[in-house]
Amino acid sequence: MFVFLVLLPLVSSQCVNLTTRTQLPPAYTNSFTRGVYYPDKVFRSSVLHSTQDLFLPFFSNVTWFHAIHVSGTNGTKRFDNPVLPFNDGVYFASTEKSNIIRGWIFGTTLDSKTQSLLIVNNATNVVIKVCEFQFCNDPFLGVYYHKNNKSWMESEFRVYSSANNCTFEYVSQPFLMDLEGKQGNFKNLREFVFKNIDGYFKIYSKHTPINLVRDLPQGFSALEPLVDLPIGINITRFQTLLALHRSYLTPGDSSSGWTAGAAAYYVGYLQPRTFLLKYNENGTITDAVDCALDPLSETKCTLKSFTVEKGIYQTSNFRVQPTESIVRFPNITNLCPFGEVFNATRFASVYAWNRKRISNCVADYSVLYNSASFSTFKCYGVSPTKLNDLCFTNVYADSFVIRGDEVRQIAPGQTGKIADYNYKLPDDFTGCVIAWNSNNLDSKVGGNYNYLYRLFRKSNLKPFERDISTEIYQAGSTPCNGVEGFNCYFPLQSYGFQPTNGVGYQPYRVVVLSFELLHAPATVCGPKKSTNLVKNKCVNFNFNGLTGTGVLTESNKKFLPFQQFGRDIADTTDAVRDPQTLEILDITPCSFGGVSVITPGTNTSNQVAVLYQDVNCTEVPVAIHADQLTPTWRVYSTGSNVFQTRAGCLIGAEHVNNSYECDIPIGAGICASYQTQTNSPRRARSVASQSIIAYTMSLGAENSVAYSNNSIAIPTNFTISVTTEILPVSMTKTSVDCTMYICGDSTECSNLLLQYGSFCTQLNRALTGIAVEQDKNTQEVFAQVKQIYKTPPIKDFGGFNFSQILPDPSKPSKRSFIEDLLFNKVTLADAGFIKQYGDCLGDIAARDLICAQKFNGLTVLPPLLTDEMIAQYTSALLAGTITSGWTFGAGAALQIPFAMQMAYRFNGIGVTQNVLYENQKLIANQFNSAIGKIQDSLSSTASALGKLQDVVNQNAQALNTLVKQLSSNFGAISSVLNDILSRLDKVEAEVQIDRLITGRLQSLQTYVTQQLIRAAEIRASANLAATKMSECVLGQSKRVDFCGKGYHLMSFPQSAPHGVVFLHVTYVPAQEKNFTTAPAICHDGKAHFPREGVFVSNGTHWFVTQRNFYEPQIITTDNTFVSGNCDVVIGIVNNTVYDPLQPELDSFKEELDKYFKNHTSPDVDLGDISGINASVVNIQKEIDRLNEVAKNLNESLIDLQELGKYEQYIKWPWYIWLGFIAGLIAIVMVTIMLCCMTSCCSCLKGCCSCGSCCKFDEDDSEPVLKGVKLHYT
């Protein structure tokens, strides 16, 4: 029952030590998938979000504590409330039914020496306080059960005895709590996550109704943000506050006579983890993946998907995270003497500034930074808040006094009397400028004239140059001879500080701290305490201010005495010298990149196998740092299903000797699939089960090869040739660990990378598409193969020589003799020799070789042949080919003209191309010259504008410095991104890291583009391999030289890494018989063609034979067919050589307008009109230079070597000439008919008669004999 209680004030109370309780070691239970919380307050809907933060790892062991009382004489009474470490954060869950868990204590010492945080529910209010508490050894709250009125009430608050110096306090609105001790199962699950980040104590919570006897429930429920407390204290330990039950009140015996209501709470520790969170349309987290849990979870995070299709995937590194942090500074105990500098009685004048070297000491810069007395504290190249984390070789402190309005000149890139003539900082200055008003010290009534500055100097000072000379300054041309006078001035001027001057004219003391970066051993470090050195584990490290994440191992590198860090070829820090032991350590990444996960698809099974690329199985545990992995990951570093392949070590797939069609290509001839396996060679199975198996890629059933035992008849005049052909059908599958490539182990960079959206996802999606295409290529190539062929080593056996490949037989070709008639014209580009060749040739084609010309020492012929020339050379080549096997060299001699004319024509093409190339080079040189002139003009213009800018704005040097800094490429900055973060503020560091990310993203995009191009090339090769698999392996190709060299017999495929090897067995002719051939036989006006092969003649008779071997057969209707007539149609192909395109040079006016149009000057601050330099501007030289450039541009004319045009006439074909003759005959016949019909003979005085003229006699010509005639083409 409920009772109304008054607020129980939290005042100091008497502490009591509890007795008679049982001390037992804590138990452990599984956290399952509990502990996920909303990482930020951003609303997300229907999206997957990857985040890096402190999370409770899934399925981790959480510590189990009890509050319980088992009745009986020897009953157990447990009241567990030990002090526990806080670490990086805590997951706290309680299962209860009687409101036993009441709150927590957070702090360091948990006593009055330091502040602590108290969060407690006193049954009426929730109270939160930050004070210097003196907590009790056994803090608890008491609940009293009043037997008379059967009611429960809060009776004791024994948590602390004193509370002082409270800085934070919160008391909630009053409420009522049910204090009754209940029986039965636990009814409430309350979960909390505690984090202490940047001075804020963050609490997340969730309440879930349950009905459990013990342990945590399975299931998923995200904790929501409860409160952020700005407490600003350090927390290293915490303790849980419980309530106990009493049945009576005995003031003198408060340590005994108590019972414990049943409750349990569970404590787990947060670790740096990457989680993939799934938000529904309402913005609720409905599911999550712990990316470091196991290989499948890592694959999901890599793909950013909760479902994974069947295949093999490269993973990112989520599995190894740093376990601890180490700090290694030199063993230095002396404090740096900054007080001697800042508290000096008198400071130096600015022209004679003083310098003190500080070394071999500990520097606590926070004392300076937090001081309220400094009006200026600006740092360059380093953040003042990060100074205590850094080390330097030396620190130099420069001190002097200047006027208040001159402090701004003590900065990089400034100008003015102080910066130019007294104290100059370099543009790349790394250090801090500290200034404060010293009017009460350095001013006096009437003026303090002891502080001087240099007013005149012939030239500006160099950085950190000190000039204390007092030589008279000569302003004119007359020598001063050391005497002041007209145009002769004393160079120093006094300030004359007075207390009544305005702030801008009051004295300011300035101290400039210059930090010498680590080019030698560190001697000045912040006040951090060094920790023990940890090797061979993933850690966060800090060596003399160099921070990062990695594994430290012993190194065999040699350092020079001054060397502190080592860098590899990529400018990455890969080694460091320990500042205490001086040992050299290698720094390697925590991750092992070559890890691929094979999965049958999450819709099929959650089983996976893991391939560690290019690693021996014995080295896997060391390579992946197995001792730092989760238990579910660790099982994939060793085990029974370990299979060493050429691609690496495969773990998790059962290796079988059977062969199957390739389901998931792994590489190096190994495949995997998910199927029922009942005959495992590794262990006997009584029941068939599903598993991932690995096997060697197979092409089908096994058979022997017939030709290996000479079972195939081979003609005696042929020889066997075996040609090896390798075609790639896939390439190495790649996946980019985008986050690791860009950010390494930097968490800040990874968080910033998330702002780039899905770039990394899209990049890997493209690479995954390439990988899927490779699998598709492989499957398409091998899917058609039904039989496997095992070929023996290719040697000489059976009397056949398999090492030689003879030349290919040529195809005879002839032209019609009727074609030798009139002309067609073709135009060629003439480099200077074709016209002379034409004059020599005349109309005699046979003089082709005789008329070869000389051009630049080469014998050349035009790259054009008429049909007559083709017929001549072809006849000679044919004759040489036919006789080559019988005439012992005579046939080869007949082939010489053909080879010579081809060589000469190639020379002709070559020299023509050379002329074209020279012209293109002229164009390029002249264009480059023109561009150079433009650049000169722009430089001149920039120079002129620069003079204007110097006159208007004296801060131009700062702009130049900025341009210089921005122009450095992203590789020039330290590759350790944490080094940037250690030196710069967050905003500045994010700008620098953003620039690095952009540069590396561009590199990745270029890489993916190259991969896509390669994938397209591989796809084309795979298509060719598939065609050859179909035509060469499964059939016999009729295409010469397509399946090997020569005439195809058979082909045998073999799998190869990323491709297929074809062994093409072909036969090539060893001897050739002389024969005459014709493409067709004309008989009775009809053309007879062979069904297969060609017609050949043995000198007396015609036969039909196959084209690839000589087997004459009598010509019959079975081996011939009739089609068409004997007319031959000849086609002429015009051969035109095009001149190279010569684009007109664009006008440079528009290009120049972009630079000269709308050019505005920067805004000028006229606040101090006296600061403007009113010197005269003289840019006449620049104008003259521009005029000269314009003249040079006009002279950028291109004089090309002229290509002549040569016109050659080609003879018309015979049918044109026949048509022409037929037309002439028709005209003559018509004329004769007209003469006869009009008595034409009477006009000739009887010389002829019309009768004879018009008489038509019978045809007395002899009949044409019927027979067979041959027609050649």
Curated annotation (Swiss-Prot):
Extracellular side: 14-1213
GO cellular component terms, semicolon-separated: host cell endoplasmic reticulum-Golgi intermediate compartment membrane; host cell plasma membrane; host cell surface; host extracellular space; membrane; plasma membrane; viral envelope; virion membrane
Uses, biotech or industry: Main component of the anti-COVID19 vaccines BNT162b2/Pfizer-Biontech and mRNA-1273/Moderna; in which the mutations of Lys-986 (K986P) and Val-987 (V987P) have been added to stabilize the protein in the prefusion state.
UniProt region (Immunodominant HLA epitope recognized by the CD8+), positions on chain: 448-456
GO molecular function: host cell surface receptor binding; identical protein binding; receptor ligand activity; structural constituent of virion
Protein name: Spike glycoprotein
Record keyword Membrane present: yes
Effect of residue 570 to D: In strain: Alpha/B.1.1.7
Short sequence motif named Binding to host endocytosis trafficking protein SNX27, residue ranges: 1237-1241
Any GO BP annotation: symbiont-mediated suppression of host innate immune response
Region Heptad repeat 2: start-end pairs: 1163-1202
